[in-house]
Each structure stands twice: as C-alpha cells, then as structure tokens.
Amino acid sequence: KDYIDRHFAEEFSLQQMADALHVSPYYLAHVCKEATGYSPLQYVLRRRIGEAQTLLITTDLPVTRIAAQVGYDNPSHFNAQFSKAVGMPPRTFRREYVYHK
C-alpha cells in the first residue's frame, strides 16, 4: 500500500512493483487485496482518481494537467476512468463541487 501511495502516478505493472518489493506478483496481489480490499490495479486506479478529485477541488489546474499529474498519458482515458469511478466527468465534478460549496 505504501509503495503504491508513493508511486501511483507512475506507469503501473504488477511485475515491476513485485520486483521493486522483492516478492512474487501472486504474493503481492494477495497481500494488497488483504490489506486494502482491492487488487493492486484497482487500488492504483482508486488512488489516482482520489488524487484527481483533490486536485480538481483544491486547484485551478486544467483537467489535462491533472490527468498527467496522476499518471494518465491520455486525457480521454482519464475522463473515461474518472466518469466510471465517480459517475460524472472531471469538469462536471469540479463545477458541481464549486456550485455546492
């Protein structure tokens, strides 16, 4: 969990993470699921979306910049992942938060 929290914005590979932690990918997946309730990939995605939500609320950075900052090379993919996780696109999320604040 700590490793993912420090490296969530970097390119993700279960094998790469397992190598960095000197464990097998199977063991890493098992421990991550046990500790967080999510697979490593699910946890990375949730961590990225959570950080994006924070940046959308606390900064005026453009959505494309936020996408890059949380580890997405493709802003369209970020928009799709964010919408799937949150139920609305990032711009709408920001607008709704500011409106209800």
Predicted regions and their residues:
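Terminal helix-turn-helix DNA-binding modules in bacterial transcription factors
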Residues: 2, 6, 11-15, 34-76, ...
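Residues within the alpha-helical elements of helix-turn-helix
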Residues: 20, 69-70, 85
